[in-house]
């Protein structure tokens, strides 16, 4: 394996540390890794902000050890919350606030706040992951907590073939097994190269630490009994020494396997609390939950464009998100409808970035961004009698209605970023981004009224008028970087991010009168023109320090973020931007140590934080449905050639709020290992080594959202997986 000469700050795994030890001493201190996510070709050592780079070797160690992508990232990224262990990454914040996820610079976040950005790519196709902690406006709104940029594998000039196959099981049942297989071929020459890959994974049943089947998540949808397919192609054309074209295409599909579902008991008795929900076969549904995406991106770069470095990108992506069938329940705990939503997004856009150095010590980055998004949705209703008799397994469509108003969003933005070396010790950074947003909302018949029409209880209804509304945001950042030594930096940073409101959540609401000759008249509705949305700004401050030595590498930052507004949908069908002060403060960091002259290494990473809101002039603990718990991970590794062994732990700590609600913490321990064969590598793992029985963070939050209105808390008690054994073989030739 070739060792990169680029010097980076990461949470090193023991195998990588051992491999790197001889090379590190030979590297010069300025051989640092260029982070593409910052759009300014700055290295980690030049960043006045907490920055992490997860290299391929350490990610592979987790994935080939059986970890899901969300689990691996939570283990390796200090500021990222623990995994939901579900299809969703809902509630997985960075530093307690939402994050933006990109694939090769293309945003996966949409205006709707559906959280499946990490259900978007098979890890087999990932080269590295770049993380910027704290608020940033580099890629538009939404990244008030941080940014994760997934950089995909690209073709190489020489012919390379990759193959990987693995399985894992807890041996609790004949259904308790997952399998994965993946292959890729890449090649070319110095002028043109490409890579084509196919990765497939099949998930079976999951069982908790007591050997009981874990419940399927019928709120955000789970991964049990599902399949995942990721087909990706990349191509690179080197036009000449300075110009390059790069093409990326992807088809991704992850959905249930059409057979297993959540049995809610005959007559939906589990919702009334008179029976226990369980997972069973026999699912026969006209809508299967899952995620389907297409992505295509074309990037042009020119390192000698009028004395500047130019990067231009155009892209298109679409996604279809389908959710698990869910009941509508009245005040008497009777199920009045059983339905499933589908939400579709089409987005295209462009990015233009130019980097220049007008004089020694002065760097300027500027550019333009533009994108357009179209959102549509529908709700499929099933025959209630059949669904009830089968416990929610036999779901035959009877009609489909709209779910939210359709809308178009256009964003236009310009940004300017500058860095100036005051002297050999200090670098001053600063920048501004201006973003203009226009929302166009379609006319929309109320959701309940559409149901009445579809059920034959009415013949027509007035439409809630749509309309157009726009708003803009100026976002600023400034930082001072101190170069203490060539291997040590400290920084003070201020940056702003913005939370863009979800139009589907606020518009399309109205009050209707009684039917007149079958027609439902609209008496009052949200007026789009008079209900202007606006972004909610977050101010983020941090003081940080990093050291990158031969054996010791560490990065630590104290941070504080505050927002003072939120968007509220009022009962009188108006929308208000109200005072709502929320602050989050904490410390994020990582320490990795390679014990000299041994095969041993050890390390920890952590994010200790507190979230508070201001109520009647007093700061109080924030709602546990949103507040992130503190987290810590640790590992110890031993890597005598050709072995590599790692024991690691992940701890999510207790968090409580002013109302007395609490999310309990837990600790899990994993054993990961590998053995280098004459051809290929055999990896093995034991996840949840001590078979801990626990409820995930999402499993503790979900009852606060859905119970008792949609059934007892036990219906939403999503457990973590018990002890699970994994075996994987990979080869590169």
From Swiss-Prot:
Main location: membrane
SUPFAM superfamilies found in the cross-reference section: Porins (SSF56935)
Induction, as annotated: Under iron starvation.
Domain TBDR plug: 43-153
Gene Ontology molecular functions: siderophore uptake transmembrane transporter activity; signaling receptor activity
Disulfide bonds: none
One Pfam family hit: TonB_dep_Rec_b-barrel
Signal peptide range: 1-25
Ion transport keyword on record: yes
Compartments (UniProt record): Cell outer membrane
Residue interval(s) of motif TonB box: 31-38
Biological process annotations from GO: aerobactin transport
Free-text function comment from the UniProt entry: Receptor for aerobactin.
UniProt similarity note: Belongs to the TonB-dependent receptor family.
Protein name according to UniProt: Ferric aerobactin receptor
Species for this entry: Klebsiella pneumoniae
Gene that specifies this protein: iutA
């Amino acid at each position: 394996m070739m060792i990169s000469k680029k010097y980076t700050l990461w949470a090193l795994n023991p195998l990588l540390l051992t491999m790197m030890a001889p090379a590190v001493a030979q590297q010069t201190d300025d051989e640092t890794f260029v982070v593409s996510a910052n759009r300014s070709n700055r290295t980690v050592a030049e960043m006045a902000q907490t920055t992490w780079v997860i290299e391929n070797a350490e990610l592979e160690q987790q994935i080939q050890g059986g970890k899901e992508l969300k689990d691996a990232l939570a283990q390796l990224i200090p500021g990222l919350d623990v995994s939901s262990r579900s299809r969703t990454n809902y509630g997985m914040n960075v530093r307690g606030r939402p994050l933006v996820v990109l694939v090769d610079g293309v945003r996966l976040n949409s205006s709707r706040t559906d959280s499946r950005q990490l259900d978007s790519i098979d890890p087999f196709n990932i080269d590295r992951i770049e993380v910027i902690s704290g608020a940033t406006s580099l890629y538009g709104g939404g990244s008030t907590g941080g940014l994760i940029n997934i950089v995909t594998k690209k073709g190489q000039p020489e012919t390379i073939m990759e193959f990987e196959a693995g399985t894992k099981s807890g041996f609790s049942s004949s259904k308790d097994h997952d399998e994965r297989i993946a292959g890729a071929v890449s090649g070319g020459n110095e002028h043109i190269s490409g890579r084509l890959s196919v990765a497939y994974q099949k998930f079976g049943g999951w069982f908790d630490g007591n050997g009981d089947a874990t419940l399927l998540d019928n709120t955000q949808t789970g991964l049990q009994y599902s399949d995942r397919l990721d087909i990706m192609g990349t191509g690179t054309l080197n036009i000449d020494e300075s110009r390059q074209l790069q093409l990326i295409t992807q088809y991704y599909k992850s959905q249930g396997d059409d057979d297993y579902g959540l049995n809610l008991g005959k007559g939906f008795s589990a919702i009334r609390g008179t029976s226990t929900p369980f997972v069973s076969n026999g699912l026969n549904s006209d809508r299967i939950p899952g995620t389907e995406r297409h992505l295509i991106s074309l990037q042009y770069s020119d390192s000698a464009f009028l004395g500047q470095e130019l990067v231009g990108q155009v892209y298109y992506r679409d996604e279809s998100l389908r959710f698990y069938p869910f009941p509508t329940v009245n005040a008497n705990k009777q199920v009045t409808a059983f339905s499933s939503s589908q939400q579709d997004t089409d987005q295209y856009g462009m990015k233009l970035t130019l980097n220049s150095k007008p004089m020694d010590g002065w760097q300027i980055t500027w550019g333009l961004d533009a994108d357009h998004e179209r959102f549509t949705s529908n709700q499929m209703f099933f025959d209630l009698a059949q669904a009830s008799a089968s416990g929610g397994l036999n779901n035959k469509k009877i009609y489909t209605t709209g779910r939210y108003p359709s809308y178009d969003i256009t964003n236009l933005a310009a940004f300017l970023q500058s860095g100036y070396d005051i002297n050999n010790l200090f670098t001053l950074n600063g920048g501004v981004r201006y973003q203009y947003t226009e929302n166009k909302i379609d006319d929309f018949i109320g959701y309940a009224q559409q149901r009445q029409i579809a059920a034959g209880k009415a013949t027509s209804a007035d439409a809630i008028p749509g309309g157009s509304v726009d708003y803009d945001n100026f976002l600023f950042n400034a930082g001072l970087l101190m170069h203490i030594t060539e291997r040590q930096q400290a920084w003070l940073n201020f940056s702003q991010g913005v939370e863009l409101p979800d139009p589907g959540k606020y518009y399309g609401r109205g009050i209707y009168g009684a039917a007149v000759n079958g027609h439902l008249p609209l008496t009052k509705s949200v007026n789009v023109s008079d209900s202007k949305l606006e972004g909610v700004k977050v101010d983020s401050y941090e003081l940080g320090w990093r050291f990158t030595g031969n054996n010791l590498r560490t990065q630590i930052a104290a941070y504080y973020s505050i927002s003072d507004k939120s968007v509220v949908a009022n009962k009188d069908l108006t929308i208000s931007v109200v005072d709502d002060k929320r602050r989050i403060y904490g410390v994020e960091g990582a320490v990795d140590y390679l014990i000299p002259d041994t095969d041993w290494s050890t390390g920890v990473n952590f994010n200790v934080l507190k979230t508070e809101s201001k109520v009647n002039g007093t700061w109080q603990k924030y709602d546990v449905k949103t507040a992130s718990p503190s987290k810590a991970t640790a590992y110890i590794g031993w890597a005598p050639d050709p072995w590599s062994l790692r024991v690691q732990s992940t701890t999510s700590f207790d968090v409580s709020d002013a109302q007395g609600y609490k999310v309990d913490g837990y600790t899990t321990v994993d054993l990961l290992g590998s053995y280098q064969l004459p051809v290929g590598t055999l990896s093995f793992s034991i996840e949840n080594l001590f078979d801990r029985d626990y409820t995930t963070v999402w499993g503790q939050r979900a009852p606060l959202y859905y119970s008792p209105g949609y059934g007892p808390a036990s219906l939403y008690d999503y457990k973590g997986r018990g002890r699970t054994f994994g075996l994987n073989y990979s080869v590169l030739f």
